[in-house]
Amino acid sequence: MLIQDQVSASLVFNVTSYLNIIGIGMDPDKDFTWYPYGASGLDIYSNGVMVSPKLLKEKPEAVKGLVNAIAKAMADVLANPQEGIDIITATEPLSNGELEMKRLQFALDNLIFSDESKANGIGAVDAERLARSITTIKELYDLPGTPAAEDVFDASFLPPMAMRSF
């Protein structure tokens, strides 16, 4: 809709949209103006791993295994990005390896490689920032309650820092 001038602005998932724009032959840096939430004063966390309370209670080792597998996959991709892209293109033949490499680099540069993740490791959160994020979301959506940060995130499931550092 944005590309067809049907709307003036759009909220998008930047990793997806940035590369989709490249994929249709446009330049996302020249043809569009981006307003990242963080750069615009909205300092909230976004994506993460969520599991049901039932799984967390009944199979905590499975949750720990899932988080460890994600961390290992992340470490493997950081160590050998091309191998990660090759797995994507082998799994999904419609994918474009060159675009997927750009997508990976964009995600790393814009979402993962930060001072916070460098200091705390990939996957960790800063408790004060998480509490602010929760408050912001509660206020934006006029939600009835405010969960405590420790009810939203449990660092005990994270693998050792050595596995999450870059």
Feature map (PLM): residue ranges:
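Helix N-cap / beta->alpha transition motif
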Residues: 36, 52, 126, 154-158
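Residue-level detector of family-conserved "landmark" positions at structurally sensitive sites
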Residues: 31, 99, 127, 147-148
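Intrinsically disordered, low-complexity segments enriched in small/polar residues
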Residues: 33-35, 43, 104, 139, ...
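Pocket-lining segment of extracytoplasmic ligand-binding domains
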Residues: 3-94
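Glycine-rich, flexible loop/turn motifs
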Residues: 17, 45, 51-52, 118-121, ...
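Conserved C-terminal helix/tail region of periplasmic/extracytoplasmic solute-binding proteins
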Residues: 130-166
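Secondary-structure end/capping motifs
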Residues: 58-141
